[in-house]
Amino acid sequence: MDNIIKDIYEKIVPPLKKLFEDHNVGKDHDISHALLVMNNCKYAILESKEKYSIENTQNMLLASILHDADDHKLFSTKNNDNLKKIMKIAGYSKEIIMKVVEMVELVSSSKNGDRL
């Protein structure tokens, strides 16, 4: 998992941080929040009784850090374009990008409402 997190810090964090800064995203959804969510995801994976594949672990961590990249309250993008652009530039395959998009959409309270 350490290599996955290292890649995310090198390839995803800088453009995501720039995106948030360029759009004056507040502290409630800035890079610190994204990193906190990813860290929570990491510990959930480590504590889970499930044993996830490397690919699923990577995808869950990517989805957790990128979950606000296209939040409609923050951006006017369509079809998760910010997320896709960041991941494409970082060198992720189209297949992985689409899996991460699916994960983000499944957990999005903006798209699915707060069901609790």
Task: Please give the residue ranges for each predicted region.
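Glycine- and acidic
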Residues: 21-23, 67
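Alpha-helical phosphate/pyrophosphate-handling elements in metalloenzyme active cores
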Residues: 25-59, 72, 85-90
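Divalent metal-dependent catalytic cores for phosphoryl transfer on phosphate-bearing substrates
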Residues: 56-116
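Hydrophobic alpha-helical packing residues
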Residues: 12, 16, 41-44, 83, ...
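Short alpha-helical hairpin
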Residues: 1-20
